Swiss-Prot record:
Homodimer. It holds the Pfam family LuxS. Its cofactor is Fe cation. It is an enzyme of class 4 (lyase). This is S-ribosylhomocysteine lyase. Belongs to the LuxS family. Involved in the synthesis of autoinducer 2 (AI-2) which is secreted by bacteria and is used to communicate both the cell density and the metabolic potential of the environment. The regulation of gene expression in response to changes in cell density is called quorum sensing. Catalyzes the transformation of S-ribosylhomocysteine (RHC) to homocysteine (HC) and 4,5-dihydroxy-2,3-pentadione (DPD). Coiled coil: none annotated. Its EC number is 4.4.1.21. The gene is luxS.
Length: 161
């Protein structure tokens, strides 16, 4: 990685991060003063493990629906194509500790769910690809490691400035 790229995550050295973690990935300010904070919610260690698509898909539905019960600041929650995490974008909300609390509440909602919201052909583009049990397992694993969500890099491997 010598040339700086346009995509923030392409400039992140994925070999030194230590998932799971919650990382501020970017800040954008609009012309009217609104500020978007984008967070990298990394569930799985890059290039070592990933979420299976049916479980990831259900987790996406569950988190997208339930996170909005805990804050009205969510702009979007999107899965990463590499299947290791999600991006969560919030408008005019910059409190990292509150983001962690919102994520914890949302993942607890996943554990309490008895169905995947919008899991049908009318509301979902691939309704056959879901796993509530898989989503719950991912949420449980993430919650079990919540004390380390603030640790982004492997010990002694922080990026050089």
């Amino acid at each position: 990685m010598t040339k700086k790229m346009n995509v923030e995550s392409f400039n992140l050295d994925h070999t030194i991060v230590d998932a799971p973690f919650v990382r501020l990935a970017g800040i954008k300010e609009g012309i009217n003063g609104d500020v978007i904070h984008k967070y990298d919610i990394r569930f799985k260690q890059p290039n070592k493990e990933h979420m299976e698509m049916p479980a990831l898909h259900s987790l996406e539905h569950l988190m997208a629906e339930n996170i909005r019960n805990h804050t009205d600041k969510v702009v979007d929650i999107s899965p990463m194509g590499c299947q290791t995490g999600f991006y969560v974008s919030l408008i005019n909300h910059d409190n990292y500790e509150d983001v962690l609390a919102i994520l914890e509440k949302t993942l607890n909602d996943v554990l309490a769910a008895d169905e995947v919201p919008a899991c049908n052909e009318v509301q979902c583009g691939w309704a056959a690809s879901h796993s509530l049990e898989g989503a719950k397992a991912i949420a449980q694993e993430m919650l079990s490691k919540k004390d380390s969500w603030h640790v982004i890099y492997q010990p002694g491997k922080e990026p050089q400035a």
